[in-house]
């Protein structure tokens, strides 16, 4: 994701259209700093305490628009062709594939989706022609020791529903919005299979934020379309969104997901075992469907996820007196009572992942940093100043789990116990 500041998402029990228009614009700003699309020319990024790696020309990977999307009817929100960035693997990694799904929030109204369609989160007309591959996408063995020489793909996010919208939900009254996220996912995966992924011996599906949620929604589909003898696993980064009320007791995220699912026809893309038992929008929450995923999954998530704290727990509309204003922007500015509330959010996450903790094939790295999307920045993925739990970086932990070197169920102690944390500061 890429971001300076956040805007309000909720007003009382319903998010107003004006709120979502502002929020969608906020998502545009947020998505490209924390995802792999770091813009080195931008001067409007959050301040942090660590140095960032210099981007070299070899880090830049060109955009490719899908060659099969048009015939498949797979379009971005505005009707443009979806795209991806592909870096070919080499040597021992030539038959290994890492596919990453970009994040960038969601849109739940015609107004917010229309606004999104005028940005790179809804139209390939605004995509950068080159992006820097960092973190889990890096080809530098010092930054990405486990997967540096794999085939790596970054699929751009331009549908607004975690690659899960369906055309049946589109308007027939002349409103030009294309809800084709599911078709984009299927078309690009088929394209990658034709490029050699059908012969993969090892593969990982990853994603950040809304893309991290998508990596869970589509995990088994990914597994089922690769060779049966391939080692296929999924890694969700910052995609474990909680179904918890905001500080005023309003069902902020649940109401939002309800609107996303209904607007974009997401129900058929969700886990059908879950949908058969409960209201479909609840099946957007990983705690409701993670147990049904057959493919091994690794969760990377901060227990103090700043996106969720700023948008789910304490949206500005739930803070009318602005008593949370400083805390939301910088966790070091939170007072003792606010820290108690944040610890409560952490407790909710611990409860939500409790069942998954018993999954023998699953893995997790749950740190106590004020962060979001940690696999796509080299400084948080694997560097001298990366967050560590039990002296392991995220990259080392994912590697130990993927290659079956050891079980990995790492849960950090509560904030502020971890001095290695990379805490975002939006002031």
Curated annotation (Swiss-Prot):
Keyword Plastid annotated: no
Active-site residues per Swiss-Prot or TrEMBL entry: 209 (charge relay system), 305 (charge relay system), 372 (charge relay system)
Class in the EC hierarchy, top level: hydrolase
Superkingdom: Eukaryota
Family recorded in the similarity comment: Belongs to the pectinacetylesterase family.
GO cellular component, one term: extracellular region
Localization of this protein: Secreted, Cell wall
Species: Arabidopsis thaliana (Mouse-ear cress)
InterPro entries, A to Z: AB_hydrolase_fold (IPR029058), PAE/NOTUM (IPR004963)
Record note on disruption phenotype: No visible phenotype under normal growth conditions.
Protein name: Pectin acetylesterase 5
Signal peptide (from-to): 1-35
């Amino acid at each position: 994701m890429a971001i300076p500041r956040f805007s309000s998402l909720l007003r009382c029990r319903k998010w107003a259209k004006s709120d979502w228009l502002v929020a969608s614009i906020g998502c545009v700003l947020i998505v490209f700093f924390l995802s792999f699309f770091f813009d080195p020319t931008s001067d409007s990024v959050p301040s942090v305490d660590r140095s960032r790696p210099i981007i070299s020309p070899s880090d830049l990977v060109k955009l490719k628009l899908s060659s099969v999307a048009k015939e498949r009817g797979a379009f971005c929100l505005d009707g443009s062709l979806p795209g991806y960035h592909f870096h070919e693997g080499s040597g021992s990694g030539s038959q290994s594939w890492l596919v990453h799904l970009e994040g960038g929030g969601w849109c739940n109204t015609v107004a917010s989706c229309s606004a999104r369609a005028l940005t790179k989160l809804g139209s390939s007309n605004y995509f950068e022609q080159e992006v820097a591959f960092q973190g889990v996408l890096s080809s530098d063995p010092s930054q990405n020791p486990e997967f540096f020489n794999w085939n790596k793909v970054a699929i751009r996010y331009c549908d607004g529903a975690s690659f899960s919208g369906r055309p049946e939900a589109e308007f027939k009254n002349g409103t030009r919005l294309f809800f084709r996220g599911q078709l984009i996912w299927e078309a690009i995966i088929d394209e990658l299979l034709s490029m050699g992924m059908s012969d993969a011996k090892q593969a990982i599906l990853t994603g950040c934020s809304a893309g991290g949620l998508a990596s869970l929604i589509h995990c088994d589909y990914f597994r089922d379309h690769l060779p049966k003898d391939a080692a296929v696993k999924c890694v969700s980064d910052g995609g474990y969104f909680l179904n918890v009320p905001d500080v005023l007791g309003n069902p902020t995220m649940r109401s939002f997901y309800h609107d996303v699912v209904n607007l974009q026809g997401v129900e058929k893309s969700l886990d059908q075992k879950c949908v058969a038992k409960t209201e479909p929008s609840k099946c957007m929450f990983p705690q409701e469907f993670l147990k049904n995923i057959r493919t091994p999954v690794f969760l990377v998530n901060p227990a103090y996820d700043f996106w969720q704290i700023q948008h789910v727990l304490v949206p500005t509309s739930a803070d009318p007196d602005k008593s949370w204003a400083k805390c939301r922007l910088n966790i070091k500015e939170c007072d003792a009572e606010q820290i108690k509330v944040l610890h409560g959010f952490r407790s909710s996450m611990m409860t939500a992942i409790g069942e998954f903790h018993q999954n023998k094939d699953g893995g997790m790295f749950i740190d106590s940093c004020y962060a979001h999307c940690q696999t796509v920045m080299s400084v948080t993925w694997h560097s001298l100043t990366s967050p560590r739990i039990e002296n392991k970086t995220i990259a080392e932990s994912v590697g130990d789990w993927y290659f079956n070197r050891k079980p990995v169920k790492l849960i950090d102690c509560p904030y502020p116990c971890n001095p290695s944390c990379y805490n975002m500061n939006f002031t």
